[in-house]
A protein has these predicted regions:
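Conserved Rossmann-like nucleotide-binding pocket used by diverse enzymes
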Residues: 7, 32-33
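Solvent-exposed loop/turn segments at secondary-structure junctions
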Residues: 38-41, 73-76, 123-127, 160-163
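C-terminal/domain-edge helix-coil "capping" segments
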Residues: 11-31, 52, 57, 62, ...
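N-terminal segment of the mature soluble domain
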Residues: 34-35, 40-112, 185
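Sec-dependent bacterial lipoprotein signal peptides
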Residues: 1-11
Protein backbone atom coordinates (compact mmCIF):
# COMPACT_ATOMS: atom_id res chain seq x y z
CA UNK A 1 0.00 0.00 0.00
CA UNK A 2 2.82 2.43 0.91
CA UNK A 3 4.56 1.74 -2.40
CA UNK A 4 1.37 2.46 -4.32
CA UNK A 5 0.91 5.79 -2.54
CA UNK A 6 4.51 6.75 -3.31
CA UNK A 7 4.05 5.99 -6.99
CA UNK A 8 0.72 7.81 -7.15
CA UNK A 9 2.15 10.92 -5.50
CA UNK A 10 5.12 10.84 -7.89
CA UNK A 11 2.75 11.02 -10.85
CA UNK A 12 0.64 13.84 -9.44
CA UNK A 13 0.27 17.01 -11.44
CA UNK A 14 1.69 20.35 -10.42
CA UNK A 15 -0.12 23.08 -8.48
CA UNK A 16 -0.29 25.63 -11.31
CA UNK A 17 0.24 25.38 -15.06
CA UNK A 18 -0.83 28.11 -17.51
CA UNK A 19 -0.07 27.84 -21.20
CA UNK A 20 -0.62 30.65 -23.72
CA UNK A 21 -2.75 29.71 -26.77
CA UNK A 22 0.24 29.94 -29.15
CA UNK A 23 2.72 28.11 -26.88
CA UNK A 24 2.52 24.81 -28.76
CA UNK A 25 3.42 26.49 -32.06
CA UNK A 26 6.27 28.60 -30.67
CA UNK A 27 9.62 27.00 -31.60
CA UNK A 28 12.25 28.59 -29.34
CA UNK A 29 15.88 27.79 -30.09
CA UNK A 30 17.95 29.61 -27.46
CA UNK A 31 16.87 30.25 -23.87
CA UNK A 32 18.63 32.07 -21.07
CA UNK A 33 17.92 31.42 -17.39
CA UNK A 34 18.07 34.78 -15.64
CA UNK A 35 20.18 34.80 -12.48
CA UNK A 36 17.81 37.28 -10.82
CA UNK A 37 15.77 34.75 -8.85
CA UNK A 38 13.38 36.01 -6.19
CA UNK A 39 14.00 34.15 -2.91
CA UNK A 40 12.34 34.30 0.52
CA UNK A 41 14.05 36.79 2.81
CA UNK A 42 17.19 35.45 4.45
CA UNK A 43 17.83 32.74 1.84
CA UNK A 44 19.45 34.85 -0.88
CA UNK A 45 22.74 32.94 -0.48
CA UNK A 46 21.09 29.99 -2.26
CA UNK A 47 20.12 31.94 -5.41
CA UNK A 48 22.81 30.33 -7.59
CA UNK A 49 21.71 26.83 -6.51
CA UNK A 50 18.11 27.54 -7.54
CA UNK A 51 19.13 29.16 -10.82
CA UNK A 52 21.26 26.12 -11.67
CA UNK A 53 18.37 23.79 -10.75
CA UNK A 54 16.18 25.64 -13.27
CA UNK A 55 18.98 25.52 -15.86
CA UNK A 56 19.42 21.76 -15.36
CA UNK A 57 15.68 21.22 -15.78
CA UNK A 58 15.51 23.43 -18.91
CA UNK A 59 18.43 21.52 -20.43
CA UNK A 60 16.93 18.14 -19.56
CA UNK A 61 13.58 19.14 -21.13
CA UNK A 62 15.27 19.20 -24.57
CA UNK A 63 12.90 21.95 -25.76
CA UNK A 64 15.77 24.26 -26.77
CA UNK A 65 18.82 23.85 -28.99
CA UNK A 66 20.84 25.78 -26.43
CA UNK A 67 20.28 27.04 -22.88
CA UNK A 68 22.53 29.77 -21.49
CA UNK A 69 23.29 29.03 -17.88
CA UNK A 70 22.59 31.63 -15.18
CA UNK A 71 26.20 31.83 -13.99
CA UNK A 72 27.31 32.87 -17.49
CA UNK A 73 24.44 35.37 -17.56
CA UNK A 74 25.44 36.67 -14.11
CA UNK A 75 29.04 37.12 -15.24
CA UNK A 76 27.90 38.98 -18.35
CA UNK A 77 25.63 41.17 -16.18
CA UNK A 78 28.56 42.22 -14.00
CA UNK A 79 30.38 43.49 -17.11
CA UNK A 80 27.41 45.20 -18.80
CA UNK A 81 25.50 47.94 -16.98
CA UNK A 82 22.82 48.12 -19.72
CA UNK A 83 22.13 44.40 -19.34
CA UNK A 84 22.06 44.68 -15.57
CA UNK A 85 19.55 47.55 -15.74
CA UNK A 86 17.38 45.77 -18.32
CA UNK A 87 17.19 42.62 -16.17
CA UNK A 88 16.44 44.57 -12.99
CA UNK A 89 13.74 46.68 -14.70
CA UNK A 90 12.20 43.61 -16.32
CA UNK A 91 12.12 41.42 -13.21
CA UNK A 92 10.91 44.20 -10.91
CA UNK A 93 7.99 45.08 -13.23
CA UNK A 94 7.16 41.41 -13.71
CA UNK A 95 7.09 40.75 -9.96
CA UNK A 96 5.51 43.97 -8.73
CA UNK A 97 2.72 44.48 -11.27
CA UNK A 98 2.80 41.32 -13.39
CA UNK A 99 3.82 43.31 -16.46
CA UNK A 100 6.20 41.83 -19.05
CA UNK A 101 8.12 44.89 -20.27
CA UNK A 102 8.75 44.41 -23.99
CA UNK A 103 11.51 47.03 -24.25
CA UNK A 104 13.57 45.41 -21.47
CA UNK A 105 13.01 41.87 -22.72
CA UNK A 106 14.13 42.88 -26.24
CA UNK A 107 17.39 44.29 -24.81
CA UNK A 108 17.99 41.14 -22.78
CA UNK A 109 17.22 38.87 -25.74
CA UNK A 110 19.46 40.86 -28.09
CA UNK A 111 22.45 40.82 -25.71
CA UNK A 112 22.15 37.08 -25.04
CA UNK A 113 21.00 36.29 -28.60
CA UNK A 114 18.12 34.33 -27.08
CA UNK A 115 14.51 34.01 -28.17
CA UNK A 116 13.25 32.84 -24.76
CA UNK A 117 13.87 34.20 -21.28
CA UNK A 118 13.32 31.92 -18.27
CA UNK A 119 12.52 33.65 -14.97
CA UNK A 120 12.35 31.79 -11.67
CA UNK A 121 10.87 32.62 -8.30
CA UNK A 122 11.08 30.70 -5.04
CA UNK A 123 8.13 30.94 -2.67
CA UNK A 124 9.30 28.45 -0.04
CA UNK A 125 12.80 27.41 0.96
CA UNK A 126 13.54 25.91 4.32
CA UNK A 127 12.73 23.52 7.09
CA UNK A 128 9.77 23.40 9.43
CA UNK A 129 7.53 21.24 11.54
CA UNK A 130 3.98 20.61 10.32
CA UNK A 131 1.54 18.41 12.22
CA UNK A 132 4.41 17.06 14.31
CA UNK A 133 6.53 16.02 11.30
CA UNK A 134 9.82 17.66 10.34
CA UNK A 135 9.90 18.70 6.67
CA UNK A 136 12.16 20.30 4.12
CA UNK A 137 10.08 22.40 1.74
CA UNK A 138 10.79 24.06 -1.61
CA UNK A 139 8.24 26.03 -3.64
CA UNK A 140 9.08 27.36 -7.09
CA UNK A 141 7.48 29.18 -10.03
CA UNK A 142 8.92 29.33 -13.54
CA UNK A 143 7.93 31.69 -16.36
CA UNK A 144 9.07 31.55 -19.98
CA UNK A 145 8.84 34.68 -22.09
CA UNK A 146 8.92 35.06 -25.88
CA UNK A 147 11.53 37.77 -26.50
CA UNK A 148 10.00 38.94 -29.80
CA UNK A 149 6.57 39.69 -28.31
CA UNK A 150 7.23 40.01 -24.58
CA UNK A 151 4.42 37.51 -23.98
CA UNK A 152 4.71 35.01 -21.16
CA UNK A 153 3.90 31.82 -23.04
CA UNK A 154 4.21 29.43 -20.11
CA UNK A 155 4.14 29.72 -16.36
CA UNK A 156 3.98 26.96 -13.82
CA UNK A 157 4.47 26.50 -10.09
CA UNK A 158 4.68 23.72 -7.57
CA UNK A 159 5.76 23.00 -3.99
CA UNK A 160 7.33 19.81 -2.66
CA UNK A 161 7.96 18.64 0.89
CA UNK A 162 10.24 15.91 2.16
CA UNK A 163 9.72 14.51 5.64
CA UNK A 164 12.81 13.67 7.65
CA UNK A 165 13.67 12.31 11.07
CA UNK A 166 17.39 12.77 11.61
CA UNK A 167 19.07 14.24 8.53
CA UNK A 168 17.65 17.30 6.81
CA UNK A 169 17.07 16.91 3.06
CA UNK A 170 19.33 18.94 0.76
CA UNK A 171 17.19 21.86 -0.44
CA UNK A 172 19.27 22.34 -3.60
CA UNK A 173 18.64 18.71 -4.60
CA UNK A 174 14.96 19.17 -3.81
CA UNK A 175 14.95 22.29 -6.05
CA UNK A 176 16.53 20.36 -8.93
CA UNK A 177 13.97 17.59 -8.62
CA UNK A 178 11.13 20.12 -8.35
CA UNK A 179 12.30 22.15 -11.37
CA UNK A 180 12.47 18.96 -13.46
CA UNK A 181 8.95 18.04 -12.35
CA UNK A 182 7.70 21.49 -13.37
CA UNK A 183 9.49 21.28 -16.74
CA UNK A 184 7.70 17.98 -17.42
CA UNK A 185 4.68 20.22 -18.12
CA UNK A 186 6.45 22.56 -20.59
CA UNK A 187 4.40 23.03 -23.79
CA UNK A 188 5.57 20.72 -26.55
CA UNK A 189 5.42 21.62 -30.27
Amino acid sequence: MGLFLFIASGCASINYNEIAPNANTFQPKVAVVLPAIKMPEGTEHDIDKVAMAIFDAATTAKRFERVIDPLTAKSQMSNDVDLQNAIMVYTSKLRSVGFSDKESILKIGKIFQADTIIVGEVSKWGYGVYAGEKNGEVGMAIKMVDVATGVIYWKAAHTDKETYHLFKPNLAKMATKLAKKIFDYIPKP
